[in-house]
Amino acid sequence: MYYKCELLVDGYSYQVTDNLVNWDDITTSFKRGDYDGVVRSFSTKFEFSNAAYSLLKRVFREKYLQASASVVFYTRNNSWLWNERFRCSLDFSTFQDNGSTISISAVDDSLAALIKAKKGTQYEYVVSELTEGKYLYYDGIEMNQNVNWLVAGNSIEDSTDVSVEIQAALKSKYFPLAVKSSETSIGGYITYGDTFQQNVSDGGKDTFLFRAERNITCFLSVSISFNVPANKALSMTLVKIGADGNEAELTRTVINDEHPETIFILSYMKDITLLEGDYCFIRYGSAYNMTLTIRDPYISLNWDARIIPVNIDIVTPVKLLNRLLQSINGGQEGITGEIASGVDKRLDECMIVPAESARGLKNAKLYCSYTKFVDWMNAEFGFVPVIGEDKVTFVHRNSLFSKNVVKDFGDNIRSFEYNVNSALIYSRVRAGYDKQDYDSVNGRDEFHFTNEYTTGVTLTENTLELISPFRADAYGIEFLVQKRGEDTTDSDSDNDVFFVNAKLVSIDGRYRLVRTINGGPSISGVISPDTMFNAVYSPRYMIEANRRFIGAFTNMLDFASSDGNSDVVIDGVPEKIDIQLSEGERLFTVGELSVESGDMKAPEDLTGLISIEKGGETYYGYIKDGKFNYGRAEAVKYTLIVESIK
C-alpha cells in the first residue's frame, strides 16, 4: 500500500486506510500566491465507510458538538518507512451521514489559513505596550515662517492703490500697517502685530510690527511707493529699537518741501539680526496735512524656525509584526514573526511612529492590520512573508527565487504548454505614498508622495501599484508634533502609521533621525537639506527595492510625474530620473509553463529552479503551483514561472 490513513480519537489511533472512500482525492498542493513564499495546503474533505463510519458516528452521538477527531495521512518512502504528509482536525459541524458513508471536512487550522481569514482585520494597540522603552529624539525640520503686512489705508475706486491721510504733527507717528497673512506654525521666535496712526511716544514697547523673542536673523523686505503732493515735506523711517532702548534707523526717506508731485520709495531688503527683545516699526513725520497714494506696497518678514525637541514613543517593525500575529492567533502565544536583517539598511534602521504618539496624546494607540503591514513591507522594501507551521518570516523577494536547479525533469514530461501571463505585464508603475494635503505652504517641499512611470509596454493597461499604506512624509510628522498640547483630534491623520529612518545613540539610549550629518545620503532641492529626514524612503528607493521584480516586464521606467516635490536630488541622483533595468537583473519572465511529470517527489528546496527539456531547448522555472495526489500514482501537475529559456 502506497499510503496510510489513521483516525485519532480520544488519544487512540485507528487504522482506517481501507475505510477511506475518496482516497483518490487526497492531494497536497504547493502554491506561490503573489510571487512570494510557497505555501503548502492539503485536502479538506474526507469520506469514510465501514469501521471508520461506525467510529465517527459513535463519537458524534456520544459527544455531539463537543466531538473531536483528527485524521493523519502518510505515504511510504523509498526505505519503506512511513512519512507523515499532513494531519488535521475534523470539523463536526460539516458532519453528513447517508447511512453507509460519513462525509466530513477538515478544519484548516494551518497558520496560512488563519492569516488568510484575519489578515484584513484592523487591530488597535496601546502604544506603551509595544514601545519596549524606545524613544525617538525628534528635533524637527527647519521650516520657513513669514508674515506679510498691508497698508491700512482707504481703497481707491477702480484701482489697487490705497490712500493714507497724513495729519500735520510735531511728533512722529506710526505708519498704518496691518497683518495681511502669516505662516507661523512654530512659536517662540517672532511676535508680530499691527501699527495704527498714533504718536510713537504713546506706543511704547508694546506697539511694533514685529519683536524678537530670541536672538535671530530674519530677512526683511520693505517696498512702499508713495505719491507725495507738490511742495509737501515728509520723512518716513524704518526703525529698530533694541531691548536696551537704543534706536537704530535701518532706512529713511526724506522729502523736502520744494519739489513737484513725485513718487518716492521706502525700500529695505536685507537680512536683519535681532537680539531678544528687539522690535521694529515704520514711522513718519510731517508738518503738512496731505493725502499719500500708496502703490504696490510689499512688507514681509521671513525667518527659519524649528520646534523644541520632544521624545516620541516608537515601535520596531518586528514587535508590531509579532503583536499582529498574536492577535490573529486569538491573543495566544505560539506564533512568532521574524524579519531578515542585514539585507536592506533602510529596514534595519527603520522605526514605526504611530500618529497619536507624534501628537503626544495620552494613552496613544496604533491602528494596523496584517494586510497593511505586508503591503508596506512589499512596497517599501521588496520584502514578502514566508509562512511556516508556526512562524512568519519576512525576507526579500529575491531570496525566494534561487538560481540553483533543484530538480531536472529532462524530457520526462507531458502536457507541455507555454503561455504569457498578461497579468504580469504593466504599462505603468506607481510608487510611493498617498498624497496628503497640508495647511502650510512648507508642505510643498514634501516629496514622499507618488511617482508615476511608464514602461513603454502597450500590450495591457495594467498598473503596478507600489503604494505604502504607512507614511514617510517628514512634514506629516512635523505638523503632528506641532499639534502637541491641542485637545482636538484630527480624523484625517490620527489613525495613520508613520515610519522613520533612525539610529540608536548609545549616549542616552534614544533614537536619532538619520540625516546627511550622521551617515544619511546628501539631499538638495528642499528648504532645509540639513534637517530633512527619511530621504532613503523616497519613491525612487521603493523602485530600487523592487527593481528585479519590475524587470520581469520592462527594461526602462520613464519618469512621468510626481504628486510632490520632484526637484529633490538624493546622493546626486534626481528623484525624477528615468530608471534603467538591465535584462540580467530580471528575477523571472512573464512566461508560464504547465507540465505533468511522473516524478512524485516534491523538491526539497521550493525556491530553486526546475529544468525541463523540450524541442532542443531547456526551460528553467520556479514553482507557481504544484498538485500531488498521494492516494494514487497520478502525474504531478506543475505550473512554473519561467526564469529563462536556453
Kindly label every feature range from the protein language model.
Residues 77, 112-176, 220, 302-407:
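Charged- and aromatic-enriched interaction segments used to assemble
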Residues 289-297:
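Edge beta-strands of jelly-roll/beta-sandwich modules across compartments, strongly enriched
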Residues 1-86, 91-276, 291, 402-403, ...:
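Juxtamembrane "anchor/assembly" segments of surface/extracellular structural proteins
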Residues 100-102, 280, 390-393:
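Hydrophobic residues embedded in beta-strands of well-ordered beta-sheets
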Residues 282-289:
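Short beta-strand-plus-loop segments that form exposed binding edges in beta-rich domains
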